[in-house]
Every structure is written in structure tokens, then in C-alpha cells.
Regions:
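Short conserved catalytic/interaction loops centered on acidic-Pro-aromatic/His motifs
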Residues: 91-97
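Conserved interaction-surface patches within small, structured recognition/assembly domains
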Residues: 58-72, 83-87
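N-terminal intrinsically disordered, cationic/polar leader segments
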Residues: 2-52, 58-60, 64, 97-100, ...
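Primarily the active-site beta-strand->alpha-helix module of PP2C/PPM metal-dependent phosphatases
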Residues: 79
Length: 135
């Protein structure tokens, strides 16, 4: 399922050859993202991103679910891809996911947008460690 989801997004992005259409598609993903404004707290703030960004996680059973918010629709759209891939997975599965797995998805984005995804993925891994689970 994880691989299929990555491949699905990779295929869609590979078919978009115009940067403005890519941003339009990413913005459409941002509109689909369910945001919880209550996560906009100092402990959920993600340092290092170009715009204000927040992420939190909850555990339901043995599955992890992330909540995300940002002042940028492009960031929201890119993170929507990440959340579609990681939400509902086990800690063990999420720990295996690296930025390299997203290389084809972010290849058409400017370096700063690529860095933002890397920073958010790093923060997600950090949040998992804070759960105290040693899987």
C-alpha cells in the first residue's frame, strides 16, 4: 500500500510538465487537507520552514496519525501527499520512510520546497521518538 501510494503520486506529478499547473494541482491538494487550528501551539511549531508550520501526532491503537497546518497552501499540498502516505501506519513503517522515498515527487519543486518536506518529515520522525515507542 505504501509503495502504491508513492507510485500513484509520482505518476501524477510526472505527467504535469508545466510548473504553474503543478502548483495549481498542489494547491488543490491543500484544499482537501483537513486542518485543526488547535495544533498551532509552540510545541507543534516546525522550525526551519519558510512559513509558519505546525505538526502533531496521535496514536490510535498501534497506528500513528499526524495533524498539520501551515500558512502556505503549497506547503499544505505537499504535506497532504506525505500525510496520505504515512497516516494510519505503524511506528515501524513510518520510521522506514525517508526523504529519498519522495525524491521523484519533489523533483520538480524548488529547493526550498524540497527542504520544507525534509524538515517536516524529520519532525514527524522526532514526534514518533517522543511517543516513547522503541519499535
Amino acid at each position: 500500500m505504501l509503495i502504491e501510494k508513492l507510485e500513484e503520486y509520482t505518476k501524477v506529478i510526472s505527467e504535469i510538465n508545466d510548473y504553474s499547473k503543478l502548483i495549481e494541482w498542489i494547491n488543490s491538494l491543500a484544499r482537501e487537507l483537513e486542518v485543526d487550528p488547535s495544533i498551532r501551539t509552540p510545541e507543534n511549531y516546525v522550525y526551519g520552514c519558510q512559513v509558519s508550520t505546525w505538526i502533531s501526532c496521535t496514536i490510535q491503537g498501534n497506528k500513528i496519525f499526524f495533524s498539520f497546518d501551515s500558512d502556505s497552501n503549497v506547503t499544505k499540498g505537499v504535506v497532504k501527499i506525505l500525510l496520505d502516505i504515512v497516516n494510519g501506519r505503524s511506528i515501524h513503517e513510518i520510521k522506514k520512510i525517508t526523504f529519498y522515498d519522495f525524491r521523484q515527487i519533489v523533483a520538480k519543486l524548488p529547493t526550498e520546497r524540497q527542504k520544507t518536506l525534509q524538515i517536516i518529515l524529520n519532525k514527524a520522525h522526532e514526534l514518533i521518538k517522543q511517543t516513547g515507542d522503541t519499535q
